[in-house]
Amino acid sequence: MTAQSVILPLPSDHARFIVLRLKDLSISELKQQIEALLSTRDRLITQHPNDQIKTAIAFGPELWSKLYSQTPEDFRQLDPQHGAFDMPVVPADVFIHIASARADICFAISQAFFNGIQSKVDVLDERACFRFFDGRDMTGFIDGTENPQFPDDRAEAALLTETAGAFADGSFIFAQRYIHNLAKWQQLKVDAQEQDRKSVV
């Protein structure tokens, strides 16, 4: 298995995340749409070689079992977490991550996948994302400072090892989305914001 192109590089300026369930889409149709996405990506890479075009496609445990006869160890649906912050779980079949230096390229690749199948899938979430200044989150703080910065360190953190056998260099994806109350946040003084960030991190 080869690491998918979006897994190891540093983030691009734009990205698109798609989470969906199959409704009336057959497995063969899904494979056709994935091929359309990948062929569009490859064509755009040829046309725009400097625009950092990268993708990853992941499958949920239920769909995986229909696609493949073997399953990576510990690959399962997560359980909801409850505590200071609730972390619900929304089971999905397909997760698509598209990244590029350009938003229009991300959109074009996503449309190649959706072409003709919109009524056959349930889109649970679709997000067009952008780099905010120098990699800050929406609260204005630099996020992800604990993430590995060097290629070897990122590979160690993100890829399955040789002990995974045929799945070595594959990855598990945990997709999370946070909602910020920016109106309330902006009423806080800077020192209070900094303290609040420390309590969360």
Residue ranges and their predicted role:
Residues 1-201:
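Long, histidine/aromatic-enriched segments associated with O2/redox biology
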